[in-house]
C-alpha cells in the first residue's frame, strides 16, 4: 500500500510539473505581446499603465529563467515596487508601483517610464535569447 501511495504522489507531482511548465507556445505569445506593448506604448501614461502587464508576463516566465537572470530582474523589480501586505501576507498580485502615488509629478513619470523601458528591454532580450538558442543547430 505504501508503494502504491508513493507512486500516485510521484505521478501527480510529475503531471502538475508538466502542466505548469512554460510552453514554447506561451513563450511565443508572450514574446509577441511584449513586442506589441513596447511598440505601441508611445506616451508616458501608456507606459505607466502597461507596467503591470509586463510584470505579469515576467511572473509567468520567471520560473523558467536561469537563477542569475531571475535574481537580477527580481532585484530590479523590487527596487521599483513594493509589496502590498494585508495582515502581514502579500495580496494576490502582490506588488504595486511605488511611484503610482506620485504619478502626476514629472520626476515620478520619468522614473516609471525608465522602469517600463528597462523592464521591457530585459524581458524582450530574454525572449530573443531563448528563441535564438532554440533555433541554432546543435554541434
UniProtKB/Swiss-Prot annotation:
**Superkingdom in the source lineage:** Eukaryota
Q: Name one GO cellular component term.
A: extracellular space
> What UniProt keywords apply to this chain's record, in alphabetical order?
Immunity, Innate immunity, Secreted, Signal
The signal sequence is 1-21
InterPro entries listed in its UniProt record: Turandot
For this chain, the annotated S-S bridges are none
One Gene Ontology term of the biological-process aspect is: response to UV
Can you say where in the cell this protein is located?
Secreted
Does the entry feature the keyword Transcription regulation, yes or no?
no
Is Secreted set as a keyword in this record? yes
Similarity annotation: Belongs to the Turandot family.
Could you tell me what this protein does?
A humoral factor that may play a role in stress tolerance.
The molecule here is called Protein Turandot B
**Designated gene of the protein:** TotB
Amino acid at each position: 500500500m505504501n508503494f502504491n501511495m508513493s507512486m500516485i504522489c510521484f505521478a501527480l507531482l510529475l503531471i502538475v510539473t508538466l502542466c505548469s511548465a512554460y510552453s514554447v507556445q506561451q513563450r511565443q505569445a508572450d514574446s509577441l505581446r511584449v513586442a506589441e506593448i513596447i511598440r505601441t506604448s508611445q506616451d508616458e501614461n501608456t507606459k505607466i499603465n502597461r507596467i503591470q502587464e509586463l510584470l505579469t508576463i515576467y511572473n509567468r516566465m520567471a520560473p523558467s529563467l536561469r537563477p542569475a537572470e531571475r535574481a537580477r530582474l527580481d532585484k530590479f523589480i523590487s527596487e521599483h515596487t513594493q509589496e502590498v501586505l494585508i495582515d502581514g501576507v502579500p495580496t494576490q498580485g502582490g506588488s504595486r508601483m511605488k511611484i503610482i502615488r506620485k504619478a502626476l509629478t514629472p520626476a515620478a513619470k520619468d522614473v516609471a517610464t525608465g522602469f517600463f523601458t528597462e523592464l521591457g528591454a530585459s524581458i524582450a532580450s530574454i525572449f530573443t535569447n531563448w528563441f535564438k538558442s532554440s533555433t541554432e543547430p546543435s554541434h
